[in-house]
C-alpha cells in the first residue's frame, strides 16, 4: 500500500538521518521508501494529491467482471449515496482496466480515482457499483498521483 507523510521538523536534519531514524522506529511490515525535503511554503502534500491508483483482487468468483467493467465505463452516470448524500460516481473514475489474474486465479482490476477535496473516489464504492461485496476483495493503493511536481528544498 502507499501512504504519504508530511512532517515538519524544528531543525534541519539530513534526509539520510531522517530515513534511518524512521526505518528504526517503524512498525514491522512498513517500509520507508523515500524521504524528500520540500519547501515549507508549498501546500501540504495531501492537498496536492490529484488521484489514487488501486489494485483490487476479487476473492470470490467474478466471471462477468469484464462485462461489468465495460458497463461501468460506458455509463453516463453512476448515482450513489455517501453518508445519505447523493453523488455521481462516474466522473470520479479516471481509469479502470482489467489486470491479469493473480497466482490463485483471482480476477483483478486497476482503478484510478479522483482524490480532490469533496470529490474523492473510494475503491469500495467501485466494488459495490460493480455488484460485488467489498468484504470479498483485497484493495491495495498502488500509487498517488500529484497535481504538480513538488520541488526539493534547497
Language model features with spans:
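Helix N-cap motif at beta-to-alpha junctions
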Residues: 10-15, 61-63, 116-117
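A contiguous pocket-lining binding segment that forms or flanks enzyme active sites
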Residues: 52-85
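Short amphipathic alpha-helices in soluble, non-transmembrane regions
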Residues: 15-26, 65-75, 125-129
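Short glycine-/aliphatic-rich beta-strand segments at the starts of folded cytosolic domains
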Residues: 3-7, 48-59
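Core RNA-modification/binding signature centered on pseudouridine synthases
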Residues: 74-154
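Short, charge-patterned binding micro-sites
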Residues: 1-9, 39-41
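Conserved loop-to-helix interface motifs that mediate assembly, gating, or partner/ligand docking
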Residues: 44-46
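Acidic, low-complexity central loop/insert segments
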Residues: 23, 27-41
Amino acid at each position: 500500500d502507499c501512504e504519504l507523510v508530511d512532517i515538519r521538523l524544528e531543525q534541519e536534519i539530513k534526509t539520510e538521518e531522517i530515513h534511518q531514524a524512521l526505518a528504526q522506529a517503524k512498525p514491522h511490515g512498513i517500509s520507508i521508501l523515500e524521504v524528500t525535503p520540500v519547501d515549507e511554503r508549498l501546500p501540504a502534500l495531501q492537498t496536492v494529491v490529484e488521484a489514487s491508483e488501486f489494485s483490487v483482487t476479487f476473492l470470490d468468483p467474478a466471471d462477468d467482471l469484464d462485462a461489468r467493467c465495460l458497463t461501468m465505463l460506458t455509463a453516463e452516470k453512476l448515482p450513489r449515496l455517501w453518508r445519505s448524500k447523493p453523488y455521481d460516481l462516474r466522473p470520479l473514475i479516471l481509469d479502470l482496466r482489467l489486470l491479469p489474474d493473480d497466482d490463485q486465479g483471482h480476477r483483478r482490476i486497476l482503478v484510478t480515482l479522483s482524490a480532490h477535496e469533496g470529490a474523492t473516489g473510494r475503491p469500495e464504492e467501485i466494488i459495490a457499483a460493480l455488484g460485488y461485496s467489498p468484504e470479498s476483495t483485497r484493495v491495495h493503493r498502488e500509487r498517488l498521483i500529484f497535481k504538480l511536481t513538488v520541488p526539493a528544498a534547497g
